[in-house]
């Protein structure tokens, strides 16, 4: 009886596998050999963006992988990226479904992972107008300046004691409070349901949910769900997500309190939701839309900005020549007597901006851009890419391509001195924020947050390794940014 049940469970997989083995009528991209049924799924965790550079060297800039029964095309050249993100932008404008993403972004009721359609268009328009417009960015300046000034005061205490500082926690807390004040109108230092110093832990928990691999993402129907159930994947995902969801629900509850005086994008969506309920609009905001927006602001806004800031500091510690050059520019240009950095100060600095660009080249916020999914059959570099194929654009590999960049793995901001190449989505060799319809709507704000954090750190303090024995690790390592720094008053 048990053998018969096993046969019934495996029969659909066998039939699909036999179908996959049929000769294809398409000219598909080359790729590594696939195992029966699972395809290249066993290689998924080992294919770090750095390793995907080797994939491109072996199979070219357009490579085909098979994750279970999900075809995935990896893109790693600027020409192929332009075909995906510009020429075929509309055809590649949707997103694939994944359980971790579905949980984190409330059944894709957000901007980043929502499938292409009317809901996504409305949510994106709202974010651009109510959160990322020039007028809104100007109104947020005082928050950014206040929080950076507070961070400087706290770091000064470490400098006075000449004790090492956990800069990772300090930067995540700084960015977390800026993002929560701008996006939610909530000051974490005055919050009764969350401690500001726990931001880094919550961001890591949210990122763990997003990265969670479940079999139902790659195998159809009940089979994948059954494996997830018996393997404990579902339970682990739900446990991690419950912590994140509790925070998002508390944020929403704050906005639903009667008599609350605030005018954030969440408040606007609540007002629109009430209006749509009264007017009977066909396209309605739900609680999931509200929490999806809250999640977008938190996950994309905090982790990416804090990570880039820490990578910038790590690279400057690795490269003392660049550290001295950029600090000399900052302190010569701004003078020695500033008590507080203002956003206008950024416009006076040239080499400093190149340091930020070089950091983004080597350490993009998302090494593989958020996956796209083809909505119809297209061609990329002469290869057929059928509908419902996932597309991963490896901006990490393109940023380190020796054909595009001299001494590609070297941190050298001088490479941009006489270059017009920028990261705003038009130069496809350098697209850390993506390009086309799905370009990150928070690119401008995110860049300002990184620049303001770095400028304050470099103007007010001198930096070194917290422990001398870390020198070899920080110079040779590449996996992680440095968390602990020695900080001294300038």
From Swiss-Prot:
Induction: By salicylic acid, flagellin, oligogalacturonides, silver nitrate, UV-C and infection with A.alternata and various strains of P.syringae. Activated by the transcription factor WRKY33 upon infection with P.syringae. It is found in: Membrane. It is an enzyme of class 1 (oxidoreductase). It is a single-pass membrane protein. It catalyses: 2-(L-cystein-S-yl)-2-(1H-indol-3-yl)-acetonitrile + 2 reduced [NADPH--hemoprotein reductase] + 2 O2 = camalexin + hydrogen cyanide + 2 oxidized [NADPH--hemoprotein reductase] + CO2 + 4 H2O + 2 H(+); 2-(L-cystein-S-yl)-2-(1H-indol-3-yl)-acetonitrile + reduced [NADPH--hemoprotein reductase] + O2 = (R)-dihydrocamalexate + hydrogen cyanide + oxidized [NADPH--hemoprotein reductase] + 2 H2O + 2 H(+); (R)-dihydrocamalexate + reduced [NADPH--hemoprotein reductase] + O2 = camalexin + oxidized [NADPH--hemoprotein reductase] + CO2 + 2 H2O. Gene3D superfamilies: Cytochrome P450. It comes from the Eukaryota. The chain crosses the membrane at residues 1-21. The keyword Oxidoreductase applies. The keyword Protein biosynthesis does not apply. Multifunctional enzyme involved in the biosynthesis of the indole-derived phytoalexin camalexin. Catalyzes two reactions, the formation of dihydrocamalexate from indole-3-acetonitrile-cysteine conjugate and the oxidative decarboxylation of dihydrocamalexate which is the final step in camalexin biosynthesis. Required for the resistance to the fungal pathogens A.brassicicola, B.cinerea, B.elliptica, B.tulipae, L.maculans and Colletotrichum higginsianum. Seems not to be required for resistance to P.syringae, P.porri, and not involved in age-related resistance. Belongs to the cytochrome P450 family. This is Bifunctional dihydrocamalexate synthase/camalexin synthase. It comes from Arabidopsis thaliana (Mouse-ear cress). The gene is CYP71B15.
């Amino acid at each position: 009886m048990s053998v018969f049940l096993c046969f019934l469970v495996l029969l659909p997989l066998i039939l699909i596998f036999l179908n996959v083995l049929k000769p294809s009528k398409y000219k598909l991209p080359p790729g590594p050999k696939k195992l029966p049924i699972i395809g290249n799924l066993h290689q998924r965790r080992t294919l770090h963006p750095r390793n995907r550079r080797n994939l491109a060297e072996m199979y070219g800039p357009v490579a085909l992988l098979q994750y279970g029964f999900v075809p995935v095309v990896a893109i790693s050249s600027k020409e192929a990226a332009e075909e995906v993100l510009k020429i075929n932008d509309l055809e590649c404008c949707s997103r694939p479904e994944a359980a971790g993403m579905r949980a984190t972004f409330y059944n894709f009721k957000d901007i980043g992972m929502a499938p292409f359609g009317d809901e996504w268009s409305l949510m994106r328009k709202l974010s651009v107008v109510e959160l990322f417009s020039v007028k809104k960015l100007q109104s947020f300046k005082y928050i950014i300046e206040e929080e950076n000034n507070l961070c400087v005061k706290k770091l000064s205490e470490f400098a006075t004691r000449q004790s090492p500082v956990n800069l990772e926690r300090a930067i995540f807390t700084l960015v977390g409070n800026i993002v929560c004040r701008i996006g939610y109108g909530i000051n974490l230092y005055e919050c009764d349901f969350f401690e500001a110093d726990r931001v880094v832990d919550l961001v890591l928990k949210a990122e763990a949910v997003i990265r969670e691999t479940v079999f139902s993402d790659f195998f159809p129907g009940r089979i994948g769900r059954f494996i997830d159930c018996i393997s404990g994947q579902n339970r682990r995902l739900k446990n991690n997500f419950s912590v994140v969801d509790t925070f998002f629900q508390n944020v929403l509850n704050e906005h639903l309190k009667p008599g609350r005086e605030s005018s954030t994008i969440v408040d606007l969506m609540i007002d629109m939701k009430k209006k749509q309920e009264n007017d009977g609009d066909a396209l309605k905001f739900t609680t999931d839309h509200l929490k999806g927006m809250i999640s977008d602001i938190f996950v994309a806004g905090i982790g990416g900005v804090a990570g880039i800031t820490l990578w910038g500091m790590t690279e400057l510690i690795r490269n003392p020549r660049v550290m001295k050059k950029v600090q000399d520019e900052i302190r010569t240009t701004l003078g020695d007597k500033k008590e507080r950095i203002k956003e206008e100060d950024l416009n006076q600095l040239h080499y400093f901006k190149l340091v930020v660009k070089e950091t983004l080249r080597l350490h993009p916020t998302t090494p593989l851009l958020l996956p796209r999914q083809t909505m119809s059959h297209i061609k990329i570099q002469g290869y057929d890419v059928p509908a419902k194929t996932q597309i991963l654009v490896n901006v990490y590999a393109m940023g380190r391509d020796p054909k595009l960049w001299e001494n590609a793995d070297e941190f050298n901001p001088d490479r941009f001195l006489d270059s017009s190449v920028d990261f705003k989505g038009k130069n496809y060799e350098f697209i850390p924020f993506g390009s086309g319809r799905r370009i990150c709507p928070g690119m401008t704000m995110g860049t300002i947050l990184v620049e303001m954090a770095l400028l304050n750190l470099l103007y007010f303090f001198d930096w070194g390794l917290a422990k001398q024995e870390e020198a070899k690790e920080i110079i040779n390592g590449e996996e992680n940014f440095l968390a602990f720094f020695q900080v001294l008053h300038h």
